[in-house]
């Protein structure tokens, strides 16, 4: 798989990032420092439930297309973000769909 963007995400304890999904791109997140809690839901599966998991240093997670994801910093954290689509210009916003309340959201 080709990586078209690498980002560096720095979050203070308690910060919640993401709360969105992508229709086209895959996103890999690698914890470099600290601890995070990822919350996901497969939006293409009507029977999918909201799931959460804590990740530590050097853990990696893949968010495929149509998987809602949020990242909460359990501790001050640093993550590398790798995506399969460029985020130059409007590349990020063009494929980012925000979700305020995942518990009531449907496609």
Describe the residue ranges of each PLM region.
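A short glycine-rich, His/Asp/Glu-containing loop-to-beta-strand
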Residues: 1-19
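Short beta-strand His + acidic residue motifs that chelate non-heme Fe in jelly-roll/DSBH
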Residues: 19, 38-39, 63, 69-74, ...
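His/acidic/aromatic-lined binding-pocket segments of jelly-roll/cupin-type domains
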Residues: 20, 26-31, 53, 61, ...
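A generic "binding-loop/recognition-motif" signal
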Residues: 24, 59, 67, 75, ...
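Short acidic-glycine-tyrosine-enriched beta hairpin
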Residues: 43-65
């Amino acid at each position: 798989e080709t990586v078209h963007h690498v980002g560096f995400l720095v979050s203070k304890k308690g910060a919640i990032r993401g709360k969105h999904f992508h229709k086209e791109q895959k996103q890999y997140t690698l914890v470099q420092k600290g601890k995070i809690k990822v919350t996901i839901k497969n939006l293409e599966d009507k029977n999918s439930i909201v799931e959460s998991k804590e990740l530590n240093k050097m853990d990696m997670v893949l968010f495929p297309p149509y998987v809602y994801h949020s990242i909460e910093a359990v501790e001050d954290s640093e993550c590398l973000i790798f995506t399969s689509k460029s985020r130059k210009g409007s590349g990020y916003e063009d494929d980012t769909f925000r979700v305020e309340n995942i518990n009531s959201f449907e496609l």
